[in-house]
Amino acid sequence: MSWRGRSTYYWPRPRRYVQPPEVIGPMRPEQFSDEVEPATPEEGEPATQRQDPAAAQEGEDEGASAGQGPKPEADSQEQGHPQTGCECEDGPDGQEMDPPNPEEVKTPEEGEKQSQC
């Protein structure tokens, strides 16, 4: 039996122990005062501009979708996949259609064009 060389598996090295933040000491908030404190609104600024923009959009979306009703799922799937001009599709699983048998495939005549998928 021949020698195979050095093993490629190395034992994991022991991890260094790092003291948790509680042991090191508390953080001083005065160091980070600019990041922690939110900006106060000015007196002339109206409070309506400070609303959450996501909440405002939800209200608009609810009003727009209430008149239209639920959309079919097929529409949302078609929007996700743009048409490439080729109408050949396999099927939902992509495995339903077998590749054509070369003996049964008809060769296109000179005047016809065959779509290539």
Curated annotation (Swiss-Prot):
Cited InterPro entries: GAGE, GAGE_fam
In which tissues or organs does this protein occur?
A: Expressed in a variety of tumor tissues but not in normal tissues, except testis.
Segments for region (Disordered): 1-117
SMART domains listed in its UniProt record: GAGE
Q: Where is the composition biased (Acidic residues)?
A: 32-45, 87-96
- Compositional bias, Basic and acidic residues, is annotated for 103-117
Which family, according to UniProt?
A: Belongs to the GAGE family.
Q: Please tell me what else the database record remarks about this protein.
A: This gene belongs to a family of genes organized in clustered repeats. They have a high degree of predicted sequence identity, but differ by scattered single nucleotide substitution. Their sequences contain either the antigenic peptide YYWPRPRRY or YRPRPRRY which is recognized by cytotoxic T-cells.
Entry protein name: G antigen 5
| Gene behind this protein | GAGE5
